[in-house]
């Protein structure tokens, strides 16, 4: 989305408020409550309130404003961001060994996101619905059922796209942030003493006074910056400047005012700790605020769901996940997609989490490990980009990395205390996703290498066929080829069993480049290998969906005319068996077989009419 047009800047900035800041914008619902709820051994004490507020404020400044908005967002791939993009950028100018390490870091970060995404909708919506306890305490038993109902409706509408509903996101979230600011300012005016907490000395005094307990309490403070990765991940949708402008003009002031307003309330009324956010509002505003909070948390959940769809598509296109059905819900916006399998798997996981944890305070114990783990990895990857890609001074880069890690590592370490009380959940989910992604990538590479090693030379085969041609039949045959310069298995088996060849043979390779988009000028490369053989290589970015009909159109413009309904597509269907291996590699091989059996078939991936496809089987040992 371009920001060159100054007239569109306010609209883009407003849209960024509606999508990018949903998660971090709903953190005031539960953050300060969890910090001062008594779980760390101290109650609502003046020094504790000032200490937590100071920590929250300076985390928002250092982590969000300086680290992500100023530094990390400099690293973009054709305007796109996200942990996998950062991984790709970091590995461009490094040795093979270093690249492997960076890839592992990027995959761990992506896996952490999958672990986090299960918790975000649950804790956000439950925190909003828990406002019922203030309005009508007798309805507290309805919190879990109502949360499930709200999220069920949200997941059900995903298949229809969020284009129409999405237009309401921005004004609702802008209203939300303005209400945050007004409620906080109202309380601060009544007790301006709370503004002393802006001084970082209070954060230092907090550590000195409470010692070990203060370190553990960082696990609650980090709730104030959950969703920070969305700022970088959504950079491609809105651009750097609108995201930064939205933060510094609307989001940051509103969050600070609300957190400090809650602190001012607690200094006067410590009993308000049961839900300081909703108790900021006058009685007459509780129900409207409850409704607005529910809408804001739904929007925050929607942003996370859309984020997991985008990450999944990127992982599929880069070869880290098996192909799956991806539906475009908008003809205008390529980023609006729906992945049915991911949608309903995520829904099931979220419902299980809500039923199991029952209250947002219990879920808060599970939140944070994945977020802070990703923060550590982002620091390492982004500074690698600064050194290798931007060629910054190595001492400056080292200084920046140390500064980032001095914040990230204590936050991550403090969250490890949550491991047994719920932190195991995102880590377990992340481990599962990491295992799946590394298994698919490594076993796929092993399979392609084996096909290359046991394949016949393409040039020699074509020369032999032209010299001693088999029976030719009219028409065009397209053979999907994964490996260049090697004869596709489907071509070999067609000659072996049918002993015929079409008049024109096209060897088609579809590949994904290390970029979000590929310009149409570079989309197709055509090479005539002989009078009757052509090789076509079609390149796509990881944000694009390969389409054979489009490839044919491009071929026609280059002089190679093809008609979809007059062409036969030959594909090989590998029947895989696991060979002799150590037991742990056999397990990985069996997991790959399971993933491969459930992967989307090639004709469906590339939108080829089923009645034009001929699949020839072959057995391959991995």
UniProtKB/Swiss-Prot annotation:
Its main location: membrane. The chain crosses the membrane at residues 9-29, 49-69, 103-123, 137-157, 165-185, 213-233, 247-267, 276-296, 337-357, 363-383, 396-416, 419-439. One of its GO terms (cellular component) is plasma membrane. InterPro entries: K+_transporter, K_trans_C, K_trans_N, Kup. It is found in: Cell inner membrane. It is a multi-pass membrane protein. Keywords: Cell inner membrane, Cell membrane, Ion transport, Membrane, Potassium, Potassium transport, Symport, Transmembrane, Transmembrane helix, Transport. One of its GO terms (molecular function) is potassium ion transmembrane transporter activity. It catalyses: K(+)(in) + H(+)(in) = K(+)(out) + H(+)(out). Pfam families: K_trans, K_trans_C. The keyword Ribosomal protein does not apply. The keyword Transmembrane helix applies. Responsible for the low-affinity transport of potassium into the cell. Likely operates as a K(+):H(+) symporter. Belongs to the HAK/KUP transporter (TC 2.A.72) family. This is Low affinity potassium transport system protein Kup. It comes from Salmonella arizonae (strain ATCC BAA-731 / CDC346-86 / RSK2980). The gene is kup.
């Amino acid at each position: 989305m371009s920001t060159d047009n100054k007239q569109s800047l306010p609209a883009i900035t407003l849209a960024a408020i509606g999508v990018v800041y949903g998660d971090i914008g709903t953190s005031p619902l539960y953050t300060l409550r969890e910090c001062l709820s008594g779980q760390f051994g101290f109650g609502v004490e003046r020094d504790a309130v000032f200490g937590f507020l100071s920590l929250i404020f300076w985390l928002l400044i250092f982590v969000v404003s300086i680290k992500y908005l100023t530094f990390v967002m400099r690293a973009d791939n054709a305007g796109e961001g996200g942990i996998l993009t950062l991984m790709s950028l970091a590995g461009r100018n490094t040795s093979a060994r270093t690249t492997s390490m960076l890839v592992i870091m990027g995959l761990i970060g992506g896996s952490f996101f999958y672990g986090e995404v299960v918790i975000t909708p649950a804790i956000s919506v439950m925190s909003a619905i828990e406002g019922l306890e203030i309005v009508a305490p007798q309805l507290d038993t309805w919190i879990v059922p109502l949360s499930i109902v709200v999220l069920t409706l949200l997941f059900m509408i995903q298949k229809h796209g969020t284009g129409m509903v999405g237009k309401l996101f921005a004004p609702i979230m802008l209203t939300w942030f303005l209400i945050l600011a007004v409620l906080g300012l109202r309380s601060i005016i009544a007790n301006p003493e709370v503004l002393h907490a802006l001084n970082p000395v209070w954060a230092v005094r907090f550590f000195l006074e409470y010692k070990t307990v203060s370190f553990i309490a960082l696990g609650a403070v980090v709730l104030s910056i959950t969703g920070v990765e969305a700022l970088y991940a959504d950079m491609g949708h809105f651009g750097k400047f609108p995201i930064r402008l939205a933060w510094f003009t609307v989001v940051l002031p509103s969050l600070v005012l609300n957190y400090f307003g809650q602190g001012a309330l607690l200094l006067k009324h410590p009993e308000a700790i049961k839900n300081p956010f909703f108790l900021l509002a006058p009685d007459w505003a509780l129900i409207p605020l409850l409704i607005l909070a529910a809408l804001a948390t739904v929007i925050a959940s929607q942003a996370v769901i859309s984020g997991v769809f985008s990450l999944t598509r990127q992982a599929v296109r880069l070869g880290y996940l098996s192909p799956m059905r991806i539906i475009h819900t908008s003809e205008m916006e390529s980023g609006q997609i729906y992945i049915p399998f991911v949608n309903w798997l995520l829904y099931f996981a979220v419902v299980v989490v809500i039923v199991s944890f029952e209250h947002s305070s219990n879920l808060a114990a599970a939140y944070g490990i994945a977020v802070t783990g990703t923060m550590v990895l982002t620091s390492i990857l982004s500074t690698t980009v600064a050194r290798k890609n931007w060629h910054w001074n190595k001492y400056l880069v080292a200084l920046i990395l140390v500064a980032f890690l001095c914040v990230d590592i204590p936050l991550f370490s403090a969250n490890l205390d949550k491991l047994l009380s719920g932190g195991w959940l995102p880590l377990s989910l992340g481990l599962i996703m990491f295992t799946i992604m590394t298994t698919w990538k490594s076993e796929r590479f092993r399979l392609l290498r084996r096909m290359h090693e046991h394949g016949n030379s393409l040039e020699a085969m074509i020369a032999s066929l032209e010299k001693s041609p088999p029976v030719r039949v009219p028409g065009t045959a397209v053979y999907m080829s994964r490996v260049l310069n090697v004869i596709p298995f489907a071509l070999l088996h067609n000659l072996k069993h049918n002993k015929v060849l079409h008049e024109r043979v096209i060897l088609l390779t579809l590949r994904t480049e290390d970029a979000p988009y590929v310009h149409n000028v570079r989309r197709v490369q055509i090479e005539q290998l002989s009078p009757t053989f052509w090789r076509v290589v079609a390149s796509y970015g990881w944000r694009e969906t390969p389409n054979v009909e489009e490839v044919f159109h491009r071929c026609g413009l280059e002089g190679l005319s093809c008609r979809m309904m007059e062409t036969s597509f030959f594909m090989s269907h590998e029947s895989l068996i696991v060979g002799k291996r150590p037991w742990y590699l056999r397990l990985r091989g069996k997991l790959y077989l399971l993933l491969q059996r459930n992967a989307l078939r090639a004709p469906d991936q590339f939108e080829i009419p089923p009645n034009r496809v001929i699949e020839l089987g072959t057995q391959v040992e991995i």
